[in-house]
């Protein structure tokens, strides 16, 4: 099975209706990630088939749970989940932030080559980031534990906004250590085609 066939089968299994050019852009992104990864070590996953399941489909599995108009992907690294999200949901304005300049250089190159007008890239530490407007959703795939995640980004979630944290096993201990003023509003167990590991999407909300 080619990576294109694997991606198409995975998208169908997830029940996603993607824009007409999404599959082509997702595969082009994967090729870029593979190319840059040889120099910049953006991901430990190097096999093309595993990159489809562990990166593309893992990110796409969370797509239906994003509401609102603006999203911040914290510690975006190689652009996960932000770039697949921006490709799958052109209605969203997605901002990627990472403190490592070589990673944001890759993200800017991907934005340009893929023609993602709804994508912005910021180099810097998230705790120092002061955008003109706060975000409907702040998300992360591999940034930190939940307590640190919400503490460092609380100033970036707008009133009525949410955090969406992508996790492996259900994070019982991390949830027990959440700071005051934050509540768990939902937990979605994600079933990712080709990925046998446990995946949870934890939805958190600030308590006004």
Curated annotation (Swiss-Prot):
Q: Which GO terms describe its molecular function?
A: rRNA (guanine-N7-)-methyltransferase activity
- What is the superkingdom listed in this entry's lineage? Bacteria
Q: Which Pfam families match?
A: GidB
Broadest EC class assigned to this enzyme: transferase
| CDD domains cross-referenced by the UniProt entry | AdoMet_MTases
Name where it mostly resides.
cytoplasm
Q: Which residues bind S-adenosyl-L-methionine?
A: 75, 80, 126-127, 141
Provide the transmembrane region boundaries.
none
Q: Where's it found, cell-wise?
A: Cytoplasm
Q: Which GO terms describe its cellular component?
A: cytosol
Q: Which InterPro entries match?
A: rRNA_ssu_MeTfrase_G (IPR003682), SAM-dependent_MTases_sf (IPR029063)
User: Reaction catalysed?
Assistant: guanosine(527) in 16S rRNA + S-adenosyl-L-methionine = N(7)-methylguanosine(527) in 16S rRNA + S-adenosyl-L-homocysteine
EC number(s) per entry: 2.1.1.170
Keywords attached to this entry: Cytoplasm, Methyltransferase, rRNA processing, S-adenosyl-L-methionine, Transferase
Q: What does this protein do?
A: Specifically methylates the N7 position of guanine in position 527 of 16S rRNA.
Looking up HAMAP family in the UniProt record yields: 16SrRNA_methyltr_G (MF_00074)
Q: Which family does it belong to?
A: Belongs to the methyltransferase superfamily. RNA methyltransferase RsmG family.
Its name, as the record gives it, is Ribosomal RNA small subunit methyltransferase G
Q: Species name for this entry?
A: Thiobacillus denitrificans (strain ATCC 25259 / T1)
Which gene name belongs to this protein? Answer: rsmG
């Amino acid at each position: 099975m080619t990576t294109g066939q694997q991606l198409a089968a995975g998208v169908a299994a997830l029940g996603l209706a993607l824009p007409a050019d999404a599959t082509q852009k997702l595969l082009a992104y994967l090729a870029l990630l593979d190319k840059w990864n040889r120099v910049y070590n953006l991901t430990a996953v190097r096999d093309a088939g595993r990159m489809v399941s562990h990166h593309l489909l893992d990110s796409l599995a969370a797509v239906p749970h994003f509401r609102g108009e603006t999203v911040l992907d914290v510690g975006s690294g190689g652009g996960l989940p932000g770039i697949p999200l921006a490709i799958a949901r052109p209605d969203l304005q997605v901002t990627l932030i990472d403190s490592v300049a070589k990673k944001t250089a890759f993200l800017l190159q991907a934005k340009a080559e893929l023609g993602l007008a709804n994508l912005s890239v910021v180099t810097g530490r998230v705790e120092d980031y002061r955008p003109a407007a706060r975000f409907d959703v702040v998300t992360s795939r591999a940034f930190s534990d939940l307590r640190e995640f919400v503490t460092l980004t609380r100033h970036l979630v707008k009133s009525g906004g949410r955090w969406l944290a992508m996790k492996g096993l259900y994070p019982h201990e991390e949830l027990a250590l959440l700071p005051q003023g934050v509540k768990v509003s939902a937990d979605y167990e994600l079933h990712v085609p080709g990925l046998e590991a446990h995946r949870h999407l934890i939805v958190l909300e600030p308590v006004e």
